Design a protein with these regions (language model features):
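Redox-cofactor binding/interface segments in oxidoreductases and associated redox assembly factors
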Residues: 10-14, 126, 146-147
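Rossmann-fold NAD(P)-binding glycine/threonine-rich loop
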Residues: 23-46, 146-180
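Short glycine-rich anion-binding loops that position phosphate/pyrophosphate groups of nucleotides
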Residues: 15-21, 129-132, 150-152, 179
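Acidic active-site catalytic centers that drive phospho-/nucleotidyl reactions
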Residues: 6, 122, 147
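Short, small-residue-biased leader/transition segments that mark boundaries at the very start
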Residues: 1-8
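Anion-binding alpha/beta catalytic cores of soluble intermediary-metabolism enzymes, centered on
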Residues: 13-75, 79
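Conserved residues at the C-terminal ends of beta-strands
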Residues: 15, 83, 176
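Glycine-rich phosphate/diphosphate-binding loop of Rossmann-like nucleotide-binding domains
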Residues: 46, 54-144, 153-167
Length: 181
């Protein structure tokens, strides 16, 4: 079985965390690919990784691409570092960036010298789910920083980037709240 079966439902976007009675694997089986706007079904995930634009890319990954396109950021030949390897943002975003001829590096908690990797980027995307982990020493002047993180510290929303520290140095940065995450 799949849902929705009613024609009145156009698309499905799943919010996490899931209720305990519903597993990620089961959800992937239930959602029809033509309704799966966040690309959690195996069919749409495979399309993203194959560069097939007939499915849906995950919303947040697509939002990052739309943002960069809106500001006419040419990705061709640019070094893009993505900090985060989730199946919902990091990995699919890497595939979308590759489709625009960027040179992509994915960093994660086990990446050695992560600060150096990030500092070498033309475009840095933070989507690790770790509050304010990206500090000024991760960045360089002229860099574009896209903060996808949504975290709460002492009841206040913040991103994966230490905005106050980093915004003084980089060419452009997205805020949290008010950004793409």
């Amino acid at each position: 079985h799949s849902f929705p079966t009613r024609r009145s439902s156009d698309l499905i976007l799943v919010f996490r965390p899931l209720p305990k009675q519903l597993s990620d694997d089961r959800l992937k089986e239930l959602i029809r690919p033509d309704k799966d706007v966040d690309s959690i079904s195996m069919v749409n995930a495979a399309k993203v990784f194959a560069g097939d634009k007939t499915g849906y890319a995950p919303c947040t990954a697509q939002a990052v691409m739309e943002l960069l396109e809106h500001y006419q950021a040419d990705l061709t030949g640019k070094k893009v570092v993505i900090v985060g390897r989730s199946l919902v943002v990091g990995r699919p975003l890497a595939m979308l960036m590759l489709g625009k001829n960027a040179t992509v590096t994915i960093c994660h908690t086990k990446t050695k010298n992560i600060e150096d990797e990030c500092r070498r980027a033309d475009i840095l995307v933070a989507c690790a789910g770790s509050a304010r982990m990206i500090k000024k020493n991760f960045t360089n002047p002229g860099q574009i920083v896209v903060d996808v993180g949504i975290n709460f510290v002492d009841g206040a929303m913040c991103g994966d980037v230490d905005y106050d520290e980093v915004s003084e140095q980089v060419a452009a940065i997205t805020p949290v709240p008010g950004g793409v995450g």
